């Protein structure tokens, strides 16, 4: 979902097997068997995000903003969390930098969806709401630089 709860089909390179969405959760875990070998490489160097430039061109996303969320998880938002849908979703965010290895946290239990909703989503939303309260072009530039540093440090 992006601004004002609008759903859209996000552009990404295919990194998973066909019908992966029917084979597991909406989140991916570490060593997820639905991710192809080439897909693992593409994800590791974050090349899967490049097609999202089309989403920026089409007006569905911005370069920096809260990451788009799957509608399945938006239904768990508190009233305060819905504020993150006032701006277009971003290709990168402070939250995506901090949670770049989210898949490892999801391996901590038997139910990745439950871990995501109960533990990860509330933490992500703290950072997203902080961003909304104090966003600026300058901070967006810093987030883009920090993102590039994280990608090239891998």
Model-predicted segments: where are they?
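Conserved small/aromatic sequence motifs within transmembrane helices
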Residues: 1-154
